[in-house]
Swiss-Prot record:
Belongs to the DDOST 48 kDa subunit family. It is found in: Endoplasmic reticulum membrane. This is Dolichyl-diphosphooligosaccharide--protein glycosyltransferase 48 kDa subunit. It holds the Pfam family OST48_N. Subunit of the oligosaccharyl transferase (OST) complex that catalyzes the initial transfer of a defined glycan (Glc(3)Man(9)GlcNAc(2) in eukaryotes) from the lipid carrier dolichol-pyrophosphate to an asparagine residue within an Asn-X-Ser/Thr consensus motif in nascent polypeptide chains, the first step in protein N-glycosylation. N-glycosylation occurs cotranslationally and the complex associates with the Sec61 complex at the channel-forming translocon complex that mediates protein translocation across the endoplasmic reticulum (ER). All subunits are required for a maximal enzyme activity. Residues 1-42 form the signal peptide. InterPro entries: DDOST_48_kDa_subunit (IPR005013), OST48_MD (IPR055459), OST48_N (IPR055457). Residues 43-427 are lumenal. Pathway: Protein modification; protein glycosylation. It comes from Homo sapiens (Human). The chain crosses the membrane at residues 428-447. Component of the oligosaccharyltransferase (OST) complex. OST exists in two different complex forms which contain common core subunits RPN1, RPN2, OST48, OST4, DAD1 and TMEM258, either STT3A or STT3B as catalytic subunits, and form-specific accessory subunits. STT3A complex assembly occurs through the formation of 3 subcomplexes. Subcomplex 1 contains RPN1 and TMEM258, subcomplex 2 contains the STT3A-specific subunits STT3A, DC2/OSTC, and KCP2 as well as the core subunit OST4, and subcomplex 3 contains RPN2, DAD1, and OST48. It is a single-pass type I membrane protein. GO terms for biological process: protein glycosylation; protein N-linked glycosylation; protein N-linked glycosylation via asparagine; regulation of protein stability; response to cytokine; T cell activation.
Length: 456
């Protein structure tokens, strides 16, 4: 106690001022750390790029430059780098993962198929580009996501839709834009030139409803060894041949698989394209760049991201929600839905958003109408009491799953709220009153009627 008393007396009795040299050092340290703090706050999405070799950074520079121009912070490493790590102390070190290393046989460091799957389960975005020299890790990762790659050294072959510069194996495919998924949020809104593709084919797991067939082969395409005669049924044939596939998991994590690493290359971006068939139109440039940018915007959640804003509900004519609604109340429900556009949240424009009023099953299902930046609707509560939910469950192709649920209680009418006379019971009322009236008349007649006396 004596030491504590002396310490307090010393601290309160004499207040020492900070020496000028100490204050100067503190201010100097603050100004030195300020730019670093600003840089950390302003950094874009952290993206790890795994390459077979660092030369890929030069051969695919246009694609990487498009990411940097949009603010992405790219970290380039070879796929077998022993220092690789996605997770540290239970936290993800990166927001996105790009795998441009199709021939990798073993990832370096702490990265493997299990950690990549955990990264996806945690909401991370992954872009994978394969080739005919595909290794087992990418094949296993595809299986985890409902995608099955063909064997190593196979390629997609199309004897009717190959480019004029093909070397004779008909593996340089010209994919028509009609084979693209009809989802502008994923593939872009602008019309594209034909797509140039050279790589391995894929097929989707028919039992996985989350797989998206982004770009398919034509009806004449198939996947096989280009330098061997066909002795067995090919792994993928016709429209079932996937060139680019996608996946949006139930936690809104997104993954894209491309069977062609060349699809993202500068040479394919800048190449002219023309089918070898006589009379085919020649295009000065492929549509690869525009499609690659659109796919990257979607997979890295720059497009198609929705969120729920303020939600309100109340009786019509009031402004605040009650503690409990009463059956057959006329209520108004409104919700704000926003969409991420160019890094900013803007009102979402949709005409197919539905509201459900659910107990166990929906009792009311109605469309929400846009009004003044929010979606609202008025409806009458059912004549059923219990615990209900205002539920908006919006799940559309290319958009993140939007879900909002608000629980409310609906009670029956109070004793004083019931009608005195129910119209459907009027016949019974008439029967009761007529019987009362009849009894009254009978009583009067019976009491006042005097029998005649018998004469002797």
């Amino acid at each position: 106690m004596g030491y504590f008393r002396c310490a307090r007396a010393g601290s309160f009795g004499r207040r020492r001022k900070m020496e000028p040299s100490t204050a100067a050092r503190a201010w100097a340290l603050f100004w030195l750390l300020l730019p670093l703090l600003g840089a950390v706050c302003a950094s874009g999405p952290r993206t790890l790029v795994l390459l077979d070799n660092l030369n890929v950074r030069e051969t695919h520079s246009l694609f990487f430059r498009s990411l940097k121009d949009r603010g992405f912070e790219l970290t380039f490493k070879t796929a077998d780098d022993p220092s690789l790590s996605l997770i540290k102390y239970g936290e993800f070190l990166y927001d996105n993962l790009i795998i441009f290393s199709p021939s990798v046989e073993d990832f370096g460091g702490n990265i493997n198929v299990e950690t990549i799957s955990a990264f996806i389960d945690g909401g991370g975005s992954v872009l994978v580009a394969a080739s005919s020299d595909i290794g087992d890790p990418l094949r296993e990762l595809g299986s985890e996501c409902g995608i099955e790659f063909d064997e190593e050294k196979t390629a997609v072959i199309d004897h009717h839709n190959y480019d004029i510069s093909d070397l004779g194996q008909h593996t340089l495919i010209v994919a028509d834009t009609e084979n693209l998924l009809k989802a502008p949020t994923i593939v872009g809104k602008s019309s594209l030139n034909p797509i140039l593709f050279r790589g391995v084919g894929m097929v989707a797991d028919p039992d996985n409803p989350l797989v998206l067939d982004i770009l398919t082969g034509s009806s004449t395409s198939y996947s096989f060894f280009p330098d061997k005669p066909i002795t067995q049924y090919p792994h993928a044939v016709g429209k079932n041949t996937l060139l680019i596939a996608g996946l949006q998991a139930r936690n809104n994590a997104r993954v894209i698989f491309s069977g062609s690493l060349d699809f993202f290359s500068d040479s394919f971006f800048n190449s002219a394209v023309q089918k070898a068939a006589p009379g085919s139109q020649r295009y000065s440039q492929t549509g690869n760049y525009e499609l690659a940018v659109a796919l990257s915007r979607w997979v890295f959640k720059e497009e198609g991201v929705l969120r729920v804003g303020p939600v309100s509900h109340h009786r019509v004519g009031e402004t605040a929600p009650p503690n409990a609604y009463t059956v057959t109340d006329l209520v108004e429900y409104s919700i704000v839905i926003q969409q991420l556009s160019n890094g900013k949240w803007v009102p979402f424009d949709g005409d197919d958003i539905q509201l459900e009023f659910v107990r166990i099953d929906p009792f009311v299902r109605t469309f929400l109408k846009k009004k003044g930046g929010k979606y609202s609707v008025q409806f009458k509560l059912p004549d059923v009491y219990g615990v209900f939910q205002f539920k908006v469950d919006y799940n559309r192709l290319g958009y993140t799953h939007l879900y909002s649920s608000t629980q409310v209680s609906v009670r029956p009418l109070q004793h004083t709220q019931y009608e005195r006379f129910i119209p459907s019971a009027y016949p019974y009322y008439a029967s009761a009153f007529s019987m009362m009236l009849g009894l009254f008349i009978f009583s009067i007649v019976f009491l006042h009627m005097k029998e005649k006396e018998k004469s002797d």
